[in-house]
From Swiss-Prot:
Cofactor: heme b
Record text on subunit structure and interactions: Interacts with CtaB.
Its membrane topology: Multi-pass membrane protein
Pathway the protein acts in: Porphyrin-containing compound metabolism; heme A biosynthesis; heme A from heme O: step 1/1
Entry-linked Pfam families: COX15-CtaA
EC number: 1.17.99.9
Protein's UniProt name: Heme A synthase
Organism: Ehrlichia ruminantium (strain Welgevonden)
One MF term in the entry's GO annotations: oxidoreductase activity, acting on NAD(P)H, heme protein as acceptor
Enzyme class: oxidoreductase
Residues at which heme binds: 262, 317
């Protein structure tokens, strides 16, 4: 994750474009949370990348879409009493999520082709942006692969595929954010000496693991099972955490265990950030920003859990995880600039 030694000098248009793409990903993550929490994701039973851009417009078309939905496990086991009006609401939420995905893809692709044609990008950047374009395409396929898992014999999507879908979004966001930072933040004015970056890599790694764990929590509906916080409750014992055999399957299949791990990692990240700030005395703006965002994220997570996963709160919790991840990347970027500045000052 070397994001310093290759600082990029690009035109203002490229910087704005990268920023818009990052915002687009965040909006997608937020809308994706709403789509999942409103149980809208399985309402569209086909994947049509081109003609799927047009929604049903007549009553006959809507009825045809509902008939397709009636063949799904979700309809058979959960929503068999759904009216056409209610179905339209679910359908339009999923439709908007897919439409936004197409728009974000085009917002990346069209300016990329333009900047490449105008020779505004270096050869290295072109190669990296081709990778991002490929990942965006794969993400579309991954989204359908996830939805398909809920159309066969279970009324919900695979939590593994849900986690893969979210992690792929995180990878795309990371690449866009990294290049945005490289193009915008070149130098800083600060005299603090930081000799080791290991702790910052640990923070980034833990946040990434936490986002993965959060996806598993969401996919397993772990936040809805009990209002006893596993980490704090005396009602949750070892047998609850390890009842699946072999024991390691609990790590990714047992909702109680996954929720427990999610809480422990959150506490661990907080402890490491506080130690870095107070004990290691890395008192720089990105460190304070990370701590502030972490406290906001912890608050959102606790409120989401206590209030039975309300849609807006839970969606904010999901997108704030990406913003927290972005702040950790910014922190590492800043620290590496400090190291370069320190070496230059010594010379």
């Amino acid at each position: 994750m070397n994001i310093i030694n290759n600082s990029e000098n690009v035109c203002t248009g490229v910087k704005i474009w990268l920023c818009i793409c990052c915002i687009g990903i965040l909006v997608m993550v937020f809308i994706g949370g709403i789509t999942r929490l409103t149980h809208s994701g399985l309402s569209i039973t086909e994947w049509n990348p081109v003609i799927g851009i047009f929604p049903p417009v007549t009553e006959k078309m809507w009825i045809a879409e509902k008939i397709k939905y009636m063949a799904t496990p979700e309809y058979k086991y959960i929503t068999s009493n759904i009216t056409l009006t209610e179905f339209k609401k679910l359908y339009l939420i999923e439709y908007f999520h897919r439409l936004l995905g197409r728009i974000v893809g085009l917002v990346f692709l069209i300016p990329f082709l333009y900047f490449m044609y105008k020779q505004k990008l270096s050869k290295n950047l072109i190669h990296r942006f081709i990778l991002i374009a490929f990942l965006i395409l794969v993400q579309g396929v991954m989204g359908w692969y996830m939805v398909k898992s809920g159309l066969i014999d279970r009324p919900h999507v695979s939590h593994y595929r849900l986690a893969m879908h979210l992690l792929l979004a995180l990878a795309i966001f990371y690449l866009l954010w990294k290049h945005f930072l490289l193009s915008v933040v070149h130098q800083i004015k600060c005299n603090i000496k930081v000799t080791n970056t290991s702790v910052f890599y640990i923070i980034i790694s833990l946040i990434t693991i936490q986002i993965t764990c959060g996806a598993l929590v969401a996919g397993l509906n772990a936040g809805l099972l009990s209002k006893d916080i596993p980490f704090l409750s005396d009602k949750v014992g070892l047998n609850d955490l390890l009842f699946i055999k072999p024991w390691w399957h609990n790590i990714y299949n047992n909702p109680i265990t996954v929720q427990f791990i999610h809480e422990v990692i959150a506490l661990l990240i907080l402890i490491i950030v506080v130690i870095t700030l107070l004990v290691l005395k890395v008192r720089i703006f990105p460190m304070y920003l990370l701590l502030a965002l972490l406290l906001i994220q912890l608050t959102l997570g606790i409120l989401t859990f206590i209030y039975n996963v309300p849609i807006i709160l839970a969606s904010l919790h999901q997108v704030t995880a990406f913003i927290l991840f972005a702040s950790s990347i910014y922190l590492l970027h800043y620290v590496k600039l400090l190291q370069i500045q320190y070496v230059k000052n010594k010379i």
